[in-house]
């Protein structure tokens, strides 16, 4: 699930 980590990482919150 690399997409999830990328999203979190990108999430400003």
UniProtKB/Swiss-Prot annotation:
Keyword presence, Thylakoid: yes
Signal peptide: none
The keyword Protein biosynthesis is annotated on this UniProt entry: no
Gene Ontology biological process terms, A to Z: photosynthesis
Key words of the record: Chloroplast, Membrane, Photosynthesis, Photosystem I, Plastid, Thylakoid, Transmembrane, Transmembrane helix
Main location class: plastid
A GO CC annotation given for this chain: chloroplast thylakoid membrane
TM region positions: 7-13
Compartments in which it is found: Plastid, Chloroplast thylakoid membrane
Membrane protein topology class: Single-pass membrane protein
Homology family: Belongs to the PsaJ family.
Protein purpose: May help in the organization of the PsaE and PsaF subunits.
Protein name (Swiss-Prot/TrEMBL): Photosystem I reaction center subunit IX
Organism annotation: Pisum sativum
